[in-house]
Amino acid sequence: MRLLALAVTTALALPALAAAQTLPTMPTLDETQAQRTVRRAAMTPPVLQEDAALQAAIGSAARPAADVARDVYRHPFETLTFWGLTPGSTVVEIQPGRAGWWTAILQPYAEATQGRYVAVNAPLDGMGVEDGSADMVLVARSFHNWHRAGRTDAFLAAFFKALKPGGVLAVEQHRSVDGLNPDVTAPTGYMPESYVIRAAQAAGFVLEARSELNANPRDDRDHPFGVWTLPPVRTSAPRANNATDRPTPLTAAERAEYDAIGESDRMTLRFRKPG
């Protein structure tokens, strides 16, 4: 049995929608460090249950070694438990990318639990499931791209339509200092948490819980090549036609400093479709 390292402080049964309205207030630009500490302490922690199939998928020798090495930053068991993944779920992952980090866990998990995993790269062309049938739509590190392309609202509407009533929109996203203009932060890969929350709420979702599972206080978001300066991408020199990049490459010492930060500071959010 897996030893559960995080204390259980809430029941796994998801709170009623009315309770979701008592979430802590959003941060402001003049928020002090003490206020930030209090606000984050009030966020809902994950509740861990023994899920043998999920543990087996995460611990599988079939997962690439490079993926496993990132578990220390991405906390797959805790994060998926926080989002409410259960055996037999129909999970739609949006734009999993070539590496498919979550895919390597979710696909075998679905197969082992008689669930369904669907990868969707172009949500506006189809969500790969019947309307109102998905238990979870998972979005990892994509809101900055959608904002730049002006597709956030249309994508969220597609997710809402695909989810069954009570279904979950699961979000992991590089997090900027809150209150900043997303037009400015998006090219760096980071997005304000309040922007993501308000966009999802405008699409009809209810914010049910936030977690600091994937927070990284070492990440000050001030990097010469955006979030891609950090692992796992580790961009170390200016990219062609990228106006936000520093014009000079990293020195060896700088490269080591950014590697020591680890992966980005990220918001981890759970939204629910009412019903």
Where do the model's predicted regions map?
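Conserved Class I S-adenosyl-L-methionine
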Residues: 182-210
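C-terminal lobe and adjacent flexible extensions of AdoMet/dcAdoMet transferase-like proteins
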Residues: 251-275
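A short acidic, Gly/Pro-enriched loop at the edge of an enzyme's catalytic core
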Residues: 127-137
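A short glycine-rich, Lys/Arg-flanked "PGG" loop and its adjoining helix->strand segment in the class I
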Residues: 152-165
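Class I SAM-dependent methyltransferase Rossmann-like catalytic core
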Residues: 54-82, 86-87
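A short SAM/SAH-binding and catalytic strip from SAM-dependent methyltransferases
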Residues: 135-153
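Conserved class I S-adenosyl-L-methionine
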Residues: 86-98
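Conserved beta-strand signature within the Rossmann-like core of class I S-adenosyl-L-methionine
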Residues: 166-174
